[in-house]
């Protein structure tokens, strides 16, 4: 894994300077094709003429070595690095290749030694500094950045702060990465830097900065998939849905080499849902569910999103079905998770009448009862929800169905020393219900006791004042 990390950072992120050999050199291209197509046992024989013709050309020898390294043939890659060194002992790219070979073998210490030699022989080669810094970053990103500062004096034309930002980004030090990038003139940033900055901003909730950088990049290349994706995500998170849908379309239909992921479908579904395009949202969430089939947690999250979309559409049966699937598969369901199912039932009941409505409210009550049993620390929450459901089952309060739950809630909350505003609001609701209940029962003394308690919490409560004859 270390090797993969080092090579990805060193090869994919670096872009300020390519090795000194020309990528389009005919000899390297020809050799690379042979290496890809020939078995390891006979490849050197197949390369004989090319090597003979270029035995004094260290750039070609290093190019051949890189071709072997790309095929994970570290033995022959190192051989050609050594051949290049033998031809020119001061040729820095040969030492960089040797370092890359050691990285592929997970020997960071040996790789560091080769990169240091490359720095020694060519103090102006940014590859050597950056790759050496990537070895150091595992131990100390700050030390790695300090190493890059040596390059600043050697190559004032290089945006060293951008290189430092890459180190911080690869070390998941996102704020420091952004701060380093902000020291660099935008015009000197390469595509990878624009992507890094925009991604760092997105991940660290600096959405406007992320969006601004993504849009800056899109001015250069409107078909860049990563930048269209980040613009789409940020606009969705910011609730700017028209813009979100615009960039979603650009990601899906007007980006080069876009690999659409489950996250993309999920975000598209959220944007459609926010725009009340429920059928489109459902379609996208189903595509996300398929794309995320290998990830149980992501797929389960998509089931909840499908439930939300069906609920918004008014399709309560599907909303309940997907939510129940979500609850079955969530690792550690919370009280809020369970309450979500009850909420769907209460929403469904509000659209019904008669016995059908009563049956649905009873299902909601059953869910909230289960909530209180499974999560005793949330018993006040459960009693509050059950009180409301039972109030709906007994709208004229004649049966007092909500009474035991409001009594339990009031008994608990009145003894709570550190009540917050939510607690006080619920306590007032409980006292008001109980005051009205006893008023209907013509037990004025008990009713007045509850109305007075309402005024203790809310001295300006008009209902309580009227009940007590104060108005």
Residue ranges and their predicted role:
Residues 444-469:
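Alpha-helical oligomerization segments
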């Amino acid at each position: 894994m270390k090797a993969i990390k080092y090579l990805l950072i060193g090869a994919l992120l670096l872009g300020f300077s390519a090795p000194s050999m020309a990528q389009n050199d005919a000899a390297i291209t020809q050799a690379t094709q042979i290496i890809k197509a020939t078995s390891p046992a006979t490849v050197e024989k197949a390369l004989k003429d090319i090597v003979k013709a270029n035995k004094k050309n260290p750039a070609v020898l290093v190019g051949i070595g890189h071709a072997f390294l790309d095929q994970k043939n570290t033995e022959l890659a190192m051989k050609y690095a050594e051949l290049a060194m033998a031809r020119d002992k001061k040729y820095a790219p040969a030492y960089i290749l040797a370092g890359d070979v050691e990285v592929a073998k997970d020997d960071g210490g040996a790789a560091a030694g080769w990169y240091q030699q490359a720095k020694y022989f060519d103090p102006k080669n940014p590859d050597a500094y950056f790759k050496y810094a990537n070895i150091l970053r595992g131990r100390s990103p700050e030390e790695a950045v300090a190493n890059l500062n040596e390059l600043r004096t050697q190559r004032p034309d290089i945006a060293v702060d951008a290189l430092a930002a890459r180190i911080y980004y690869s070390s998941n030090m996102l704020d420091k990465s952004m701060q380093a990038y902000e020291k660099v003139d935008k015009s000197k940033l390469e595509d990878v830097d624009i992507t890094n900055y925009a991604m760092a901003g997105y991940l660290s909730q600096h959405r406007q900065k992320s969006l601004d950088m993504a849009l800056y990049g899109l001015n250069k290349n409107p078909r860049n998939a990563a930048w269209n994706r980040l613009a789409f995500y940020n606009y969705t998170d910011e609730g700017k849905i028209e813009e979100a849908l615009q960039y979603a379309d650009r990601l899906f239909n007007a980006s080069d080499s876009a690999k659409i992921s489950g996250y993309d479908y999920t975000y598209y579904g959220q944007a459609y849902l926010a725009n009340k395009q429920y059928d489109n949202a459902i379609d996208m969430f189903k595509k996300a569910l398929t794309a995320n089939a290998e990830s149980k947690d992501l797929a389960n999250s998509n089931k909840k999103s499908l439930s939300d979309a069906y609920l918004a559409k008014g399709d309560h049966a599907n909303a309940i079905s997907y939510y129940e699937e979500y609850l079955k598969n969530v690792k550690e369901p919370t009280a809020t998770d369970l309450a979500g199912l009850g909420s769907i039932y209460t929403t469904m009941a509000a659209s019904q009448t008669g016995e059908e409505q009563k049956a649905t409210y009873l299902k909601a009550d059953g869910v909230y009862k289960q909530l209180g049993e499974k999560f005793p620390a949330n018993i006040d929450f459960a009693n509050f929800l059950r009180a409301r459901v039972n109030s709906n089952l007994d709208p004229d309060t004649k049966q007092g169905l909500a009474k035991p739950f409001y009594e339990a809630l009031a008994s608990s909350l009145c003894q709570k020393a550190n009540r917050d505003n939510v607690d006080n609001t619920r306590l007032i609701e409980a006292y008001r219900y109980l005051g009205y209940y006893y008023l209907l029962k013509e037990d004025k003394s008990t009713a007045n006791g509850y109305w007075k308690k309402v005024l203790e919490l809310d001295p300006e409560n008009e209902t309580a004042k009227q009940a007590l004859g104060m108005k």
